[in-house]
Amino acid sequence: MIRLVAVDMDGTLLGPDGRVSDRNAHVIRCMQNMGVELLICTGRSYEDALLPLEEAGLKASVVCMNGASTYDVRGRRIGKVELAGTQVEQIVECCKDADVIFDFMTDKGSCTIAEEEAFKDYFNRNVLLPMAEFSYEGVRRRFTFLPPGELFERGLEFYKISVIHESPLVLDGLRERLRAVPGLAIASSAATNLELTHQEAQKGKALAEYAAMRNIRRDEIMAVGDSENDHSMLSMNLKYTVAMGNAVERIKKTAKCQTRPNSQDGVAYAIENLVLPYAINSE
């Protein structure tokens, strides 16, 4: 019997409009009423992960920023893994000649050292790929724009850094350079970004730690995702690892099975077929 369902957000639980569909929300509530836990595993910050959950009337524990921070269902932080200051310095140095946009996720929210005009241009050309439910002004309000010289003067704790560029080829080159940074995990959630965390801050590791705290075995877990930053949890030896129908090929090859795309309530379909029948029979 499945006791824990770990679900990515963007491209997975959320539809193309950036919202939890009525069907997904209904099926998740049915699952929770049967005693099965929902664990959100997302690249978003905790605050940004809560927005669509609250809109849908759902509550869940949340692994955020690709595993850099974990919150329980009451909103209490129960785990965090920061990037070291030397890692952040090396990341900035590796990317300094590539004309990238940085999104630094910190204990004080998101900040960037980009010029605002360049930032807005990337948004307007769909390079920034913000959360679908946000307008430019909504995204702009999330960020503090810092002069480059102030980045290391504010005593910030860095949890995740997104490196954004319109050219996948440029990002491929940066990925190779960044491999030289010790202890760095490199993932991606889109063709125009790299997502950087400490190597101990990955969705799979955070999922394993959460399950251990809850005394849930790996054969009692189902995980669902769509992009490269879900690989660490979909490559785990769980009862079910499920790729969305819209998932990238690497994820489809990694997962044990495949569900419908996020535009067709793929999370609900997976839960209805792999979780609810057995939860019902166990009552």
Q: Where in the sequence are the language-model features?
A:
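Conserved acidic, metal-coordinating active-site core of Asp-based
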Residues: 94, 98, 105-224
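Active-site phosphate-binding/coordination module
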Residues: 22-127
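Hydrophobic packing residues within well-ordered alpha-helices of enzyme cores
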Residues: 24, 49-53, 174, 251, ...
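Mg2+-dependent phosphoryl-transfer enzymes with acidic/Ser/Thr/Gly-rich catalytic loops
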Residues: 1-4, 15, 20-21, 179, ...
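Residue-level signal for inorganic ion chemistry
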Residues: 31, 42, 66, 161, ...
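Short, hydrophobic/glycine-enriched beta-strand segments
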Residues: 3-8, 40
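Short active-site oxyanion
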Residues: 35-39, 59-60, 160, 219-221, ...
